[in-house]
A protein has these predicted regions:
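Conserved catalytic cores and adjacent C-terminal regulatory segments
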Residues: 2-396
Length: 396
């Protein structure tokens, strides 16, 4: 819908005195429904301030996402024919409910047994990705990275060059080879090993030089892309980007960060050393319906980002500018990235709603554990507080 004179305006560069605002969304397959629930609430609060046309892309300098979070990022920032976001935040949850069962079709009968799943995993990825690829291309069309309505950061990993490839709005200005179609970027960052096939595509730079990408899920290097986003902004400050000229490279008190996880099964403690000591290669790759090695790498990288940012913001006494929303109490099928039954998807929706009511948690730097704050403020209240911060919204 076209914007009217009373509708909100895209946030001004931080040189106008505003905070550098970052929204970051973890990877996690179908568990992307959890952050989808959180951001729907966040956008509704912004709409209470600035009207129903308000969208998250109008308020954040950077929106970043890995894997399923990368898909959400594209949906929030890709322009429609009126140059407004293709999706509102509240439309993402129904999108997941409709399409996840087709992206991750569940086998029944003999085909759904553990043995059958194991045999299939030996012959290739668990899912062929055809429905996902077609869906993403249909929704995003030929929209390219430089066209997003705010800056985006989406990590992937190139298995040919063996290094991360970060598709960033900031980097595309100097490296046009990264100006790929959003559909190609989303398919790449979602290509989780063992679940979906690796993805290959080529792109031309402004001089006509062709570059080939051989990409898999960004979760193998940055399942929590918050720090990648902050690094991108910091590089712009060092390069004296005029949007950031009044901000010093280490002035992290000027950052406002909302980082949303997709849930973990930490509290379930489903693995232990006695169990893993008996594992061979196969067990490390797939064990009792899980993928231990992949889960460990993605979770450890996400937690290290949270630990680093918690330590940094607490040292600078700006911890109230960093909100990490995560649920470590998932169990059973709720912690799966691909069990896309109606029952499980509905449960994940409820987990997201419940997470809003849970107290804000922060890393205890003494023991590394995430602990609820003593003041009892909920994630819902914390989001409301951030929305009402004076520099967070601008109105025409």
């Amino acid at each position: 819908m076209e914007r009217t004179q009373s509708s909100i305006q895209q946030i001004q560069p931080p040189t106008y005195g505003n905070l550098v605002t970052i929204l970051s969304i973890d990877g996690g397959g179908i568990r992307g429904i959890i952050p989808a629930t959180i951001i729907a609430f966040l956008e509704s609060q912004l709409q209470e301030l600035d009207g129903e046309d308000a969208r998250l892309a109008d308020y954040f300098d950077v929106i970043s996402g890995t894997s399923t979070g990368g898909l959400v990022t594209a949906m929030l920032t890709a322009p429609d024919n009126n140059n407004r976001p293709l999706f509102s935040a509240k439309e993402i949850k129904p999108f997941y409910m409709e399409h996840c069962p087709k992206i991750f079709p569940q086998h029944s009968g003999i085909g759904g047994t553990t043995l059958a799943k194991l045999v299939r995993s030996m012959g290739g990825p668990k899912y062929d990705g055809k429905y996902l690829h077609g869906l993403v291309r249909e929704k995003l069309g030929d929209i390219r990275l430089h066209e997003t309505l705010t800056n985006v950061v989406i990590p992937t990993f190139d298995i040919k060059s063996m290094q991360p490839v970060v598709f960033s709005s900031y980097q595309v200005k100097k490296s046009t080879i990264l100006d790929a179609k959003l559909s190609d970027i989303c398919i790449s960052t979602s290509a989780a090993p063992t679940y979906l096939p690796a993805y290959n595509f080529s792109n031309q730079d402004s001089e006509g030089n062709l570059h080939e990408f051989n990409l898999i899920d960004g979760g193998v290097c940055a399942n929590n892309p918050t720090l990648v986003s902050m690094n991108d902004v910091t590089k712009q400050i060092i390069k004296e980007n005029p949007d950031f000229f009044s901000i010093k490279p280490m002035e992290y008190g000027r950052f406002l960060i909302i980082s949303i996880g997709t849930g973990t099964a930490k509290n379930e403690e489903k693995f232990n050393a006695a169990m893993a000591a008996k594992w061979g290669l196969l067990d490390w790759l797939t064990h009792s319906g899980t993928t231990p090695l992949i889960d460990i790498f993605s979770q450890s990288s996400a937690d290290m980002v949270d630990f680093h940012l918690s330590a940094l913001t607490q040292a600078l006494r700006s911890q109230d500018n960093y909100l990490r929303i995560q649920d470590d109490t998932l169990t059973g099928t709720n912690s799966s990235v691909d069990i896309a039954t109606k029952e499980n998807l509905e449960k994940l929706c409820q987990i997201g709603e419940n997470l809003l009511k849970k107290p804000v948690s922060r890393v205890n730097l003494e023991n590394g554990l995430c602990e609820p704050l003593k003041d009892g403020i909920t994630n819902e209240d914390a989001l409301k507080r951030l929305v009402k911060m004076g520099n967070f919204h601008t109105v025409m």
